[in-house]
């Protein structure tokens, strides 16, 4: 279910304040955040935000196509390493 239109999109206030401050000064540096639920706003385009995936911070460069999506969509939390391989031992058990 989507968020109510009367509430508007959510973005962490501290994250947005840091972005606004960097836009005013023209500074470009990586911003660490744990706020995966924050919506990407147009002011964030061109910045790199390090989004926490539960273990480390994944650097995400924000482009225009990402506006309207959530930060967490670009930092996967699970890593698929593949299904078990068919070995000599596993086939002998059958």
Swiss-Prot record:
This is Small ribosomal subunit protein uS19. The gene is rpsS. Pfam families: Ribosomal_S19 (PF00203). GO terms for cellular component: cytoplasm; small ribosomal subunit. Protein S19 forms a complex with S13 that binds strongly to the 16S ribosomal RNA. Belongs to the universal ribosomal protein uS19 family. It comes from Pelotomaculum thermopropionicum (strain DSM 13744 / JCM 10971 / SI). It comes from the Bacteria. GO terms for molecular function: rRNA binding; structural constituent of ribosome. The keyword Hydrolase does not apply. Keywords: Ribonucleoprotein, Ribosomal protein, RNA-binding, rRNA-binding. The keyword Magnesium does not apply. Transmembrane segments: none annotated. One of its GO terms (biological process) is ribosomal small subunit assembly.
């Amino acid at each position: 279910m989507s968020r109510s239109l009367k509430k508007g999109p959510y973005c962490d206030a501290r994250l947005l304040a840091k972005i606004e401050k960097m836009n005013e000064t023209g500074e470009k540096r990586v911003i660490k955040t744990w706020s995966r639920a924050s919506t990407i706003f147009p002011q964030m385009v061109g910045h790199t935000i390090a989004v926490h995936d539960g273990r480390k911070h994944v650097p995400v460069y924000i482009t225009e196509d990402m506006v309207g999506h959530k930060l967490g969509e670009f930092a996967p939390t699970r890593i698929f390493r593949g299904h078990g391989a068919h070995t000599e031992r596993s086939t002998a058990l059958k």
